[in-house]
Amino acid sequence: DDALADCLRALETQTFERFEVVVVDNSGANRVQARSARVRVISNTSNVGFGTAMNQAIRASEAPYVAALNDDAEADPAWLEKLVAAAEARPRAGMFASEVRLAGSGMLDSAGMLIAADGSSKQRGHGEPPANFAKSKDALCPSGSAALYRRKMLDEIGLFDETFFLYCEDTDLGLRARRAGWECGYVAGATVVHRYSHSAGRATPLKAYYVERNRLYTAIKNLPFAMLVTAPFYAVARYFWHVVSMLEGRGKVAEFRKAGYSAALLPFLVVRAHVSALVRMPRLISERRRIRRSARISTGEFRALLAEYSINVRQVAAL
């Protein structure tokens, strides 16, 4: 795969030298071969999903930091050096967001994540000029496309939720970490160029289903009760704004139609996502209780944090 080859070539140029690369091959066809002694390959017989693959890579190493990087992303030579320097300077921060830029346009893909009142998450700064985020600052949590995690934090709160399979695992992990009292930094200049949705497609039935289902998983597990009660109403509002954005030729639903799919398919995917969440409700409630028991900040503090890094559902629908 050309994207993966470019990704690995970029890692070979890193100014930070004390690292190893673990590539998890989810193709089921042993398509990835190690390029050097620094690269280790874990080959799965089938696609086990993003969360499981990430956890395999994390368990395969004992390093104090874990850097996540999508196979369709290319890191600037100073990427790791800047992330590790930021981590060394902030021991209470357990995760760090990169300055992720969109391939081609040079605009931002993400400078951390934002969350809506229904549990939807979107990339902070998506489509904006990098100059808008030229200074390092705090973030809610990083996008898993290019992030640094402190192993001590992962040992404490757990790894990625493997039941998500695809999408939103980074938000779920980030919210669990914030509830446990860990901070998150955004590191300006720790630059990665990302071919957005190169691997799974920008707007497909697969993506629509998993994003909606995992939004529900994330909300049920993590949102404060008062927000969880109102989340369905905000979700309905988001569905309405999706229709409006589609008619205006904007947003993911418009992309879905341009890709050749019928918008009439989306309600069925939404229903399927809700049925899946209902089936898994006992486990989600159990996880919610576990997260609450391990919380180190109050519900009020957590709500204030979510409000600080919020995005309204109309904006979610338009992006």
Protein language model regions, located:
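Short aromatic/hydrophobic "clamp" motif used to bind/position activated sugar donors
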Residues: 66
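Glycine-rich, basic loop-to-helix element that forms the pyrophosphate-binding segment
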Residues: 43-61, 71
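Active-site-adjacent helix/loop segment of glycosyltransferases
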Residues: 180-286, 300-307
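A recurrent flexible, glycine/aromatic-enriched loop bordering the glycosyltransferase active site
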Residues: 107-109, 120, 128-152, 171, ...
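Acidic helix N-cap motif at the loop->helix transition within catalytic regions
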Residues: 29-38
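Conserved donor NDP-sugar-binding/catalytic core segment of glycosyltransferases
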Residues: 74-115
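A short, conserved alpha-helix in the catalytic core of glycosyltransferases
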Residues: 140-191
